[in-house]
Amino acid sequence: MYLSLRLVSLALCIAPLASAGNNSTPLVQACTGYSFPRVACMYRYASKMPLDFYRKASVDISNVDTYSSTEVANDDSFQQVGKATFLVWDQQRGSEILGSDPAYDIVFTISTGGHEAPVYVPDTNELWFSELGKGELHQQVISLDGDSPTISEVLTDPPLYAPSGARYRNGKIYFSAGGGNSTLEGGPYHPGIYSVDPKTRKSTIEVNNYFGWYFNQVSMPTAHTRGGSPLSHFCTLVDPRLVAHGLTFQHRPTTWILTNTVASGLVILVSSWTRDLTLVHTDAAIVLARNHGTSTVAPQVQASVYRYDPETGAVNIVDDTLHCPNGVAFSPDYKTLYLTDTDAGVPMIDPRVPLSEVPSLQYNSTNRRTVYAFDVSEDGSYLKNRRPIYTAKDFVPDGLKVASNGYVITGAGKGVDILDTTGTPLLSIQTNFTAVNMVFGGKNLDELWIVGHGAVARARLNLTGPALE
């Protein structure tokens, strides 16, 4: 009798497992109210696939595998993933983001090199971004006046070399520049944070060293404000080993926070009752910059996050746990700082290897490709409670922004992922180019502009960026 019961129990356990590979419901479905497959709903996050599925992991950074390349032999619906512009992971919240009439279009075709540091300037209704090319000193400027956007080149005075992050605040653009070169015209150039008056094109150095060491890279700035608060801004600048980018402003009492990574990244937190500015910067990009030719110097300091006080000039370390900090942004209430770790991009950092022999960036999908969240202390002086919230489904989470409602947005491979505060995917925008960074622009901050390798795109969704000062 006992043996019979054991056998029955075993049979009951095996039965569900035997049927687990047979999905009766298609993984990819039409979404109510939208055209299919342009908008595709993923059934239960496609977390249970028929057993005969396979995704090949690429090690070629020029041809990284994508989610849509997954082979799902026993579910023909999955072929629609590659045809979709929008992938909806959470039907209720994803549909709320899409709104009634979502739009996506390629506005400009540009060179296939890396493009970074998009920033919207409300004073002039312009969108600036950079080209991370060897010896490239011009910035790209898109005018949003008129019926159709136009694009032109601008040379600041002095020039900026390889900015990988930017934020706007109080009439100025704050760039995190990652280029390092002593012989390039107009130089020498060193990674750091530079401010630019978008009307006069004049640039000014804000910070460019850590006790005499070059920052590896400065990257991706972002700005935030808190209306009516007496606290100052916290500006975060992140710079991964691949490229420098990451800068954000937050209302916080009197400090700047900087991050510095072996690859790229300097985070600066600036906060003052009178100055009202906080910068966070990560420094790691020199490593990456050296691999793509925009820096001639090997990394000198470890990947870290620092606090910088603009009143005294003091720089203090606040985090050194990320391997390659890159994208950075604050939550709307400034209580959470989000950082990306793009360690899957593997650079050559050995200073003994001559610049002429430094190989291009390598890729390893088993390294970190993660978005992290940190709590910010009440006085804004340190970070705590680090936790991973998302591993990118494609490539690495590069640029990072936070919408006015708190949703986290990251450029990752051939697309942009929109997450809730826990890192759960809600919606993905699929692009036919590598999406590096993005920014909310337009007079109502309701256009998401995406820059990367080969294109500038614009998405119009029911989502807005945080207010600018």
Swiss-Prot record:
<dbReference type="InterPro" id="IPR052988">
    <property type="entry name" value="Oryzine_lactonohydrolase"/>
</dbReference>
<comment type="similarity">
    <text>Belongs to the SMP-30/CGR1 family.</text>
</comment>
<feature type="signal peptide">
    <location>
        <begin position="1"/>
        <end position="20"/>
    </location>
</feature>
<keyword id="KW-0378">Hydrolase</keyword>
<dbReference type="InterPro" id="IPR011042">
    <property type="entry name" value="6-blade_b-propeller_TolB-like"/>
</dbReference>
<comment type="pathway">
    <text>Secondary metabolite biosynthesis.</text>
</comment>
<keyword id="KW-0732">Signal</keyword>
<comment type="function">
    <text>Lactonohydrolase; part of the gene cluster that mediates the biosynthesis of oryzines, natural products with an unusual maleidride backbone. The two subunits of the fungal fatty acid synthase oryfasA and oryfasB probably form octenoic acid. This fatty acid is most likely activated by the acyl-CoA ligase oryP to give octenyl-CoA before the citrate synthase-like protein oryE catalyzes condensation with oxaloacetate to form tricarboxylic acid.</text>
</comment>
<protein>
    <recommendedName>
        <fullName>Lactonohydrolase oryH</fullName>
        <ecNumber>3.1.1.-</ecNumber>
    </recommendedName>
</protein>
<dbReference type="Pfam" id="PF08450">
    <property type="entry name" value="SGL"/>
</dbReference>
<dbReference type="GO" id="GO:0016787">
    <property type="term" value="F:hydrolase activity"/>
</dbReference>
<dbReference type="InterPro" id="IPR013658">
    <property type="entry name" value="SGL"/>
</dbReference>
